[in-house]
Amino acid sequence: MPMPMVELFRGGLLESVHVGDAAAVDQEGRIVACLGDPCLKTFWRSAAKPIQALLPYISGAVGEYGISDEEYAVVCASHFGEEIHTRAVLSMLGKAGLSESDLSCGIHYPFSKKAANALVSAGAKPTQLHHNCSGKHTGMLMTCRKMGWSTEGYFLPDHPLQKATLDIISEISGVAKNEIGLGVDGCSVPVFYLPL
């Protein structure tokens, strides 16, 4: 059962309590501290991004295409759709001979209010570059290009890229591939269902 983790006070009075489950493990994977159920299964969602970002590095795409540390950081995380982020995504796509039209992450307004307001003020619409997962998707596309895999359908579970990603998730988590549940994340790629 989830445990209280955060209490919010307003004017000295308890306004709300947020519950959750958490686990801390050592380098051997042994649970050293927990709240609630440390074996609770959940979708990793964006918490998987640093692991998903290993493939562009391991495949050699990061080196081959001259990806800077700043650009690679956008592959590893969710971003706010600010110009610094969209520029990095566009730069990486160009370095790998790709374009925004190769992305399949979808479109939404930037999470940054300033960036979203700037688009509205300019009468412009958001693009896939503004999607908070466009960096991750760019990393996936660069990996496909480097490995000689088709970029078509790179987001589908049976694509070689997603199979390789599942292999890495299994290896790092210590959970067998056939025990990892799959769903579809909000940006169209597989999302992994594993214990905390």
Locate the predicted segments by residue.
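Beta-lactamase-like hydrolase cores
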Residues: 1-39
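Generic secondary-structure signature for well-ordered alpha-helical cores
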Residues: 27-30, 61-62, 94-98, 146, ...
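Glycine/charged-rich beta-loop-alpha catalytic/anionic-binding loops adjacent to active sites
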Residues: 29-39, 71-72, 120-125, 176-185
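Active-site SXXK
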Residues: 44-62
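A generic, well-ordered mixed alpha/beta core segment in the N-terminal half of proteins
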Residues: 70-137, 143
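Active-site helix/loop module of the DD-peptidase/beta-lactamase fold
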Residues: 77-81, 85-88, 165-177
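Active-site-proximal helix/loop microenvironment
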Residues: 126-162, 170-196
